[in-house]
UniProtKB/Swiss-Prot annotation:
Metal-binding among keywords: yes
GO molecular function, one term: iron ion binding
Gene Ontology biological-process entries: tRNA threonylcarbamoyladenosine modification
Protein residues bound to Fe cation: 108, 112, 288
Binding site for substrate: 130-134, 163, 176, 264
Gene3D superfamilies: 3.30.420.40
Source organism superkingdom: Bacteria
UniProt name for this protein: tRNA N6-adenosine threonylcarbamoyltransferase
Disulfide cysteine pairs (residue numbers): none
Length: 302
């Protein structure tokens, strides 16, 4: 089965073609450089960028692949920016009519869940930590069709906080990669931050940590590097600690990391030490992409 995937939930325009769960083609155009001048994504402008990019990507893929061989279309339905999601939906429906094949709506978070499964299939039950600019969740899967959210952020998502901390410290956008690059040499003085406590055992809260960094930055007692690197370390430790708590309660056969923040080196290295069977996507597949959307449909139909 050959599936075409479409991903337009935020600021990445991506189209992929997979066959039997393997990636044949994928083109992803990021809007990060465009929005760096604004310090963040502007939904209306993002929709315009998607409208321009998605047609160009389709034209390029059509020159490389025979679209008449495609059996089904998978497009991101939710969650995401309403305007950008609409672009993907309209293109999926148009292709569906032209190619006379069905277009299936896919949940973006499920895409991140399956993003690390291209090399080898998961062994269930599985636990997943999905962390991105819009989401921070712990998910327990009895099998590929029964996935339950057992913990989520009560306020900000971790990727969003990386962006806000970086903006406050004048480090640029997107915040995650900027902070990671700054702290790569590991040469900084740790500024202790208080980790939040939540009523839900596996829930997250990042607004307090964000506020601490902003307040300390206003006091001008610490360098931007010390604050940024301390935030990264404390935030990653917090994510790992929550994941460890889940592992103590649930017996699982696979531990999965997904979402844009999964590209963070510190998180990836710490995650590898938590379980004997860890699945981590490549950096290309950690960020928003259409291959993971197509993979969800493949798992549902196979």
């Amino acid at each position: 089965m050959i599936i075409l995937g479409i991903e337009t939930s935020h600021d990445d325009t991506s189209i992929a073609i997979i066959e039997k769960g393997k990636i044949l083609k994928m083109i992803t155009w990021s809007q990060s450089d465009f929005f760096a001048q604004y310090g963040g994504t502007i939904p209306e402008l993002s929709s315009r960028q998607h409208s321009q990019n998605i047609i160009r990507i389709i034209d390029k893929l059509k020159s490389e692949f025979d679209f008449s061989k495609i059996d089904a279309i998978a497009y991101t339905e939710k969650p995401g920016l309403i305007g950008t999601l609409q672009i993907g939906f309209l293109v999926a429906q148009a292709l569906s009519r032209v190619l006379k094949i069905k277009a299936y709506p896919i949940d973006h978070i499920e895409g991140h869940f399956f993003s690390a499964s291209f090399e080898k299939n998961y062994l269930f039950p599985a636990l997943a930590l999905i962390v991105s600019g819009g989401h921070s969740q712990l998910m327990l899967a009895k099998d590929k069709d029964n996935i339950e959210v057992i913990g989520s952020t009560l306020d900000d998502a971790i990727g969003e906080v990386f962006d806000k901390v970086a903006t406050k410290l004048n480090l640029g956008f997107p915040g995650g990669p900027k902070i990671e690059a700054l702290c790569k040499d590991n040469d900084f003085d740790l500024v202790k931050l208080t980790k939040p406590k939540t009523q839900g055992e596996f829930d997250f809260s990042f607004s307090g940590m964000k506020s601490q960094v902003i307040n300390l930055a206003n006091q001008k007692k610490h360098s931007s590097k010390n604050l940024a690197c301390s935030f990264q370390k404390e935030a990653v430790d917090y994510l790992l600690e929550k994941t460890k708590k889940c592992l103590e309660k649930y017996k699982i056969n696979s531990l999965i990391l997904g979402g844009g923040v999964a590209a963070n080196f510190l998180l990836r290295e710490g995650f590898k030490k938590l379980h004997e069977n860890v699945y981590i996507p490549s950096k290309e597949l950690a960020t928003d992409n259409a291959a993971m959307i197509a993979k969800v449909l493949y798992e549902k139909l196979k």
